[in-house]
Amino acid sequence: MDPRLTHIRDWIFDLDNCLYPASTGLFALIDERMGAYIQRLLGCDPVEAKTVQKRHFHEHGTTLAGLMKEHDVDPHDFLEDVHAIPLERVQCDERLGRLLPRLPGRRFVFTNGDAPYARRVLERIGVSDHFEGLHDIHATGYRPKPDPHGYELLCARFGIDPAYALLADDMVQNLVPAKALGMTTVWVDNGSERGDHGFAEDAIDFRVGDLGDWLEQVLGGTE
C-alpha cells in the first residue's frame, strides 16, 4: 500500500466517467435523452433545448437541479426517463473487480445520478458487491456535487471522518468541497467534459489518467 494512503478508512468513488472510462461515451446517451426531455417539456427545438440543458448544468451543477428550480420538474420522472438507456457500451472490468476488495476499509459510490441507474451500471462493470453504500442525488436532497451539503450528508449518513476518507472523481470542481472537509482527493483526468472546470491545484492530491492503473500502483504487490 502506498504509504501516503495508509490512513484511509473510507474510499469514495464517483460513478460516471470514473468507475468506467469517459471514452465509453455512456453519458452522451444520457445527454441525448436530457435534450429530448427538455424539448418535450418546453416545446422547443433541439438547439434551444441544448442551450437550456447546458446552462442549467453549468449554473446549477446538474441539468436536473436547474429544471427543478426553474420549471418545477419532478426529479423521479426526469431521472427515470433520462437513465432509460442501453448499457452495452459498459464493459465488465475484471481488474477493477479484483482491486476494489483489496482496499482496506469501506467503499462507497457518491453520484449525481440516482440509485437504480447506478446499480445497473455497477452490475455491468461487475463491481456491485464491492460497495458498502451508495449516496445518490435523492440522498443529497437534490443538491448535487459540488454543493458541500451533499458531502456533509454523506459523511453523517455513513459515519465517515473526512480526515480518513478519499474521494475519486473525474471533475475537479467536485473535489474542491471534499478537500475543504479534509478528504484526500483523486482527480481521474480521463477526458470528461469540463473535467478541469474550476481547476484548483491545491484541491488535488493525486491526478491519474485511469482509476484501475492507479489502484494497481497504490496497492502494489500480488493479490
Where in this protein do the model-derived segments appear?
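Asp-based, Mg2+/Mn2+-dependent phosphohydrolase catalytic module
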Residues: M1-R9, G97, P101, D114-A115, ...
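Short glycine/serine/threonine/alanine-rich loop segments
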Residues: C44, V73, G105, I160, ...
